Amino acid sequence: MTTEALPLTLAEKVWQDHLVVKGEDGSPDLIYIDLHLVHEVTSPQAFDGLRVAGRPVRRPDLTIATEDHNTPTIGIDKPIADLTSRTQIETLRRNAEEFGVRLHSLGDIEQGIVHVVGPQLGLTMPGITVVCGDSHTSTHGAFGAMAFGIGTSEVEHVLATQTLPLKPFKTMGITVEGELRPGVTAKDIILAVIAKIGTGGGQGYVLEYRGSAIRALSMEGRMTVCNMSIEAGARAGMVAPDETTFAYLKGRPHAPEGEDWDEAVAYWTTLQTDDAAVFDAEVFLDAGEIEPFVTWGTNPGQGVSLSQDVPDPADIEEPNARAAAERALEYMDLKSGTPMKSVPVDAVFMGSCTNSRIEDLRAFASVIKGRKKAEGVRVMVVPGSARVRLEAEAEGIDKIVEEFGAEWRFAGCSMCLGMNPDQLAPGERCASTSNRNFEGRQGKGGRTHLVSPLVAAATAIRGTLSSPWDLEHEDADTRTGEKVGI
């Protein structure tokens, strides 16, 4: 159990509890890994390495695989058309069978985006270490876990040893105090954080999100915030566990039961940053000042409130940042001074490991219910897992989506990244609930604006970047953010 000789942050407590060997003379520590998540893109070479060395997977019981990045979101009962995608998925299936790793394949009720599947199964728990060959592994930090992405060589190392050599991360406390206004969500919080500290502001840090606004978030909201810690340059993001965490986990398939549950909760309640602990850096935000947010450029830090205009690079003092803004505006085909609300879109994507859970789908559906999408705008709604999809259909969300004129898809990473059939055409502009807006991220030449599910829904209705606030002004009968339950 954690020793309390010195005041520690949450991240430091979890690190100490997983220390196998303390590094000396500048060498890294050796850290034990409790949960290893695997998908089809970053695992083939790792399994090949095991095969060449004649090594087994050391802890197949702590390893779980799912198919997500390359999977189609329509016609999942048909052969995968793209050769590369099909090969990667077939390779994962062979590797999982050969090495005894549990795999959730297409058609399995538990298949889906790896960072949705882990929490919904109760595999992600407070105080554990989680790794995956995917940068958005930070999602799992919402439970008070130390969770971070690793490269393919590290995937092999964990498969072989269930450990990783690592140097301790720095810690940054991000405190968000106050109450969010109706229509403002967890996605707006993290976009505001990234806009404040920049895409490199968290480099080398574990970010711990704190304050009354964070505590008021659901687990889905906390996962959204922690998910995009990587877009701030951080290694991981964490939220200390509390009753909200415990309520989410209780009764899930892999959560402890009976006396084991009581013992687990007793330990989990110790996973709080000590009052006297000192962060290496701290950032503070006022939740009441955060508005619905949107990115205008080609990195997640290039964002503004939706009520603002496209910024002028001339107002940016730092030369590299100014040059990046100029290039971003050219790629995005935007002019300085243009109101963000006047920017038209060709597509809306509702999905990704950032915003594809049942709460996200409910929020989106509550805004579009009884309405029709804007003419000429393609709207794609992709649940994060087969189980989320089934739950949404039981609530009638699929019917709301289809009556709205949108596409209701099967689970997968989908249009978050240009690695499967769901892509933008060159020049198309998309309001997306995903996490990255780099050049070509959603397809070669595609232009991405990162938004919340509520902004995505309002944008799909109006055809231009919009929030529920805009719908409220247009129609007195339109559901407001309060009625949406956000």
UniProtKB/Swiss-Prot annotation:
It comes from Leifsonia xyli subsp. xyli (strain CTCB07). [4Fe-4S] cluster binds at residues 353, 413, 416. HAMAP family: LeuC_type1. Binds 1 [4Fe-4S] cluster per subunit. Keywords: 4Fe-4S, Amino-acid biosynthesis, Branched-chain amino acid biosynthesis, Iron, Iron-sulfur, Leucine biosynthesis, Lyase, Metal-binding. This is 3-isopropylmalate dehydratase large subunit. Its cofactor is [4Fe-4S] cluster. Pfam families: Aconitase. The lineage of its organism: Bacteria, Bacillati, Actinomycetota, Actinomycetes, Micrococcales. It catalyses: (2R,3S)-3-isopropylmalate = (2S)-2-isopropylmalate. One of its GO terms (molecular function) is 4 iron, 4 sulfur cluster binding. The gene is leuC. One of its GO terms (biological process) is L-leucine biosynthetic process. It comes from the Bacteria. Pathway: Amino-acid biosynthesis; L-leucine biosynthesis; L-leucine from 3-methyl-2-oxobutanoate: step 2/4. Catalyzes the isomerization between 2-isopropylmalate and 3-isopropylmalate, via the formation of 2-isopropylmaleate. Disulfide bonds: none annotated. Heterodimer of LeuC and LeuD.
